[in-house]
Amino acid sequence: MYQYSAFRSRLSAGAVRVALVVLLGAATSTLDAQQPQDLVRQVNRSGPRFGVTWLGGSIVDTLRSRFDIDVAPVVTQFGWQFERQFASLENGPVALNEWIFLVGGLDQGAFLPSLTWLVGIRTPGNFEIGIGPNATPAGVALAMSTGYTFRVGALAVPVNMAIVPSKYGIRSSILTGFNLYR
């Protein structure tokens, strides 16, 4: 058990370092080029989100022992993402601020709320990456997310993957949703 815990800690620390280097590198390279007159309006990409989360490690056991919540290792997620971009250049990357409120386990008669705040970047090609705190009944952790937004007519359809390593195990999610493409 100790070897797994040490490996998971090194893996989590390495993933956080990589995510921070990518975010900082992308942010600093574009901030130098920005002029106030080049900045464009903010875009609201808030909308419903839904998907699934895999609960790894001892998360299922922790929920059972601490909260008397009995769920399978895979739970559905439903919720809302509030998203704003900070600023962007006409054809440059966008700095993002996202709050994601989800309720998991409804398919199993459980209520597992989570709140995640992500700060990240979306490229002109609609690829995005973000990192930030996550709070659930099982505790707090650091969430790392990446995804791509497809354009389907007047809709923006994001597909995001997130990994949340915690002391109880790793949660992995795939979420999608929609909002108006503005």
Q: At which residue positions do the language-model features occur?
A:
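Transmembrane beta-strand segments that form the barrel wall of outer-membrane beta-barrel proteins
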Residues: 94-105, 126-137, 155-165
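Outer-membrane beta-barrel channels and translocator barrels
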Residues: 87-89, 124-126, 151-153, 181
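Outer-membrane beta-barrel architecture
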Residues: 81-83, 118-120, 145-149, 175-177
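Cleavable N-terminal export/targeting peptides
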Residues: 1-41
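Residues that define the transmembrane beta-barrel architecture of outer-membrane proteins
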Residues: 72-78, 111-115, 136-142, 155, ...
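Mid-length scaffold segments of soluble, non-membrane domains
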Residues: 102-123, 128
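Outer-membrane beta-barrel "beta-signal"
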Residues: 168-182
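Short glycine/proline- and aromatic-enriched beta-strand/turn motifs that initiate or cap beta-hairpins
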Residues: 33-79, 179-181
